[in-house]
Design a protein with these regions (language model features):
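Membrane helix-loop-helix hairpins that form the core translocation module of multi-pass transporters
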Residues: 167-175
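Glycine-centered structural positions embedded in regular secondary structure
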Residues: 85, 173, 207-209, 348
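Short intrinsically disordered coil segments
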Residues: 104, 184-189
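Internal active-site segments that recognize and position negatively charged phosphoryl groups
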Residues: 192-228
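Short, charged/polar, Gly/Pro-enriched secondary-structure boundary elements
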Residues: 176-180
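Compositionally biased, low-complexity flexible segments
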Residues: 2-23
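Short glycine/proline-enriched coil/turn segments at helix->beta-strand junctions
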Residues: 164-167, 206
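A glycine-rich beta-to-alpha transition motif near the start of alpha/beta enzyme domains, typified by
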Residues: 24-165, 218-352
Length: 352
């Protein structure tokens, strides 16, 4: 994503945000006793956003029964198809417990029913939301022309996506500092609230906790060599790294190396740059994480002070995404914009 394209998408995202700002209505999920069809024999769509890959089931009326065990089996890269997460494409009105959400945000006809690779439910995934919109468009469920927007439902609230060719800008909603209970006060005063021991890195590392709205713990490193030395292989947040205080609902860990700012080709303010790795809650290390990139940009902005860039280019192992945090991400009504690709790879039919 070149800076010029990022500036164009930033304007598109702002227009989408002005037209339909995300509502913080949430879904209070319930279970239903209605018998549903098995997942066997169904068609799944495989795709990715910056190599953060997902399996999607188009199930508009929620007719298919999907268990956590089935999700975990399908996402297993050895015994299944392999993916970082699973998404049911469902009408909001068909999701149990979503009635009040649908009434609050009637334009959010479609809901991103998202699950981590271990089958656990998650609030939101930025990369998956772009792929979700692309699938809606590709399957003919909606028509989203270049420059047009769509609002979808997620467990983190409504999200608006704007198409710009092969890229999508997602209004990710507001960022929030978590302020974990038991945080060390003097660390918090300096922009840190947690310490983390990461395998492969020496000693405790200071970190900042950010909600997007799912929880993130961001650690700044000095060099790219140090970033490479972190031992993430085979780890999940359930057994490592070690956090103090320990996040009660788990967390996504981002390791980030700030890089030199990049000039804006349109003559605007410099664009911040960084390289990152992520250990996702319920998944392990992934090639990219949309909410994680947003959390990293917000943390960098917080650490940089008054002259902090409003825009960031974040390089992940899976590619580059752009994040707009604005002049003050904590201001009332402020939201974070995420820009990146969405690519459909294949359609797969499960055995009966």
């Amino acid at each position: 994503i070149r800076v010029t394209r990022q500036a164009r998408l930033r304007r598109a995202g702002r227009a989408a945000g002005a037209a339909t700002s995300p509502r913080l209505a949430t879904v209070t999920e319930t279970t239903d006793a209605a018998a549903r069809a098995p997942l066997a024999g169904r068609t799944l769509i495989k795709g990715h956003g910056a190599q953060n890959d997902f399996l999607l089931l188009v199930d508009p009326e929620r007719e298919v029964d999907v268990s956590a065990a089935e999700v975990a089996a399908l996402c297993d890269r050895r015994a299944g198809i392999g993916a970082d997460g699973f998404v049911r494409v469902v009408r909001t009105a068909a999701l149990p417990g979503a009635q009040s959400f649908h009434e609050a945000v009637p334009e959010a006809e479609w809901f991103m029913d998202y699950y981590n690779a271990d089958g656990s439910v998650a609030e939101m995934c930025g990369n998956a939301s772009r792929l979700f919109a692309a699938v809606l468009n590709e399957e003919g469920l909606v028509s989203i022309a270049d420059g047009e927007s769509i609002t979808i439902g997620t467990r983190g609230g409504a999200r608006t996506l704007t198409r710009a060719g092969e890229l999508w800008t997602v209004d990710m909603g507001p960022a929030r500092l978590i302020r974990p209970e038991g945080a060390v006060a003097d660390l918090d005063a300096e922009g840190w609230d947690t310490t983390v021991v990461v395998p492969g890195l020496e000693g405790e590392r200071a970190a900042l906790s950010v909600a997007m709205p799912n929880p993130h713990t961001v650690v700044a490193l000095a060099t790219e060599a140090e970033l490479e030395s972190a031992l993430f292989a085979g780890l999940t947040d359930s057994d490592a790294p070690d956090y103090d205080p320990r996040p009660p609902s788990g967390t996504n860990l981002e390791l980030v190396v700030p890089l030199a700012d990049e000039p804006d080709d349109e003559g605007g303010a410099p664009v911040g740059r960084a390289r990152m790795r992520v250990l996702e809650r319920g998944v392990g290390e992934t090639r990219s994480c949309g909410t994680g990139c947003c959390a990293v940009a917000v943390a960098l902005h917080e650490w940089s002070g008054e002259d902090a860039p409003e825009d960031y280019l974040i390089d992940t192992p899976g590619g580059r995404v752009g994040v707009h945090v604005g002049a003050d991400p904590w201001a009332p009504g402020a939201t974070v914009l995420l820009t990146g690709p969405a690519q459909i790879v294949a359609r797969l039919v499960l055995p009966p």
